[in-house]
């Protein structure tokens, strides 16, 4: 599968990623809590590395669903304020929240095993 042979927005549907923006971020992600770990995928249109994640996510969607994350997504090329909020130096970036607290972030797509390990560590610290 080449980097351009798929619709990059398919991953949003596949993982039930809810769109967020700078105006509604706190209400949706931070205050929309519970015990479920929230993962915000910050990306940019035509970002090669973002598309690598999207492609990998489509190939490994079952494994990513098994992580029991509530997914959100935002194009920070379009929503510059949200990118500034997290002082992004690159995308993709994944930011994690639980019960209103920011727990950490991953910059870049490290690959499925490393992503799974990072999520497992955050979930174990609950």
Q: What is each PLM-predicted segment?
A:
Residues 17-22, 42-44, 61, 66-81:
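Thiol-based oxidoreductase modules, predominantly thioredoxin-like and allied folds used
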Residues 32-46:
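Short active-site neighborhood of thiol/selenol oxidoreductases, capturing the structured segment around
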Residues 47-50, 94:
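The canonical Cys-X-X-Cys-His
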Residues 49-65:
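Typically the conserved alpha-helix immediately C-terminal to a functionally engaged Cys/Sec
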Residues 85-89:
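A short glycine-leucine-enriched loop at secondary-structure breakpoints
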Residues 90, 95-126:
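Non-catalytic, surface beta->alpha helical segment in thiol-disulfide oxidoreductase systems
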């Amino acid at each position: 599968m080449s980097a351009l042979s798929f619709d990059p927005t398919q991953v949003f549907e596949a993982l039930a990623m809810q769109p967020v923006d700078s105006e509604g971020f706190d209400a949706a992600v931070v205050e929309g809590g519970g015990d479920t770990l929230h993962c915000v995928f910050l990306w940019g249109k035509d970002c090669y590395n973002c598309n690598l994640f999207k492609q990998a996510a489509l190939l490994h969607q079952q494994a990513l669903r098994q992580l029991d994350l509530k997914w959100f997504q935002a194009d920070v090329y379009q929503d510059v304020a949200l990118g500034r909020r997290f002082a992004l130096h690159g995308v993709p970036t994944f930011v994690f929240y639980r019960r209103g607290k920011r727990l950490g972030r991953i910059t870049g797509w490290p690959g499925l095993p490393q992503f799974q390990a990072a999520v497992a560590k955050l979930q174990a610290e609950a």
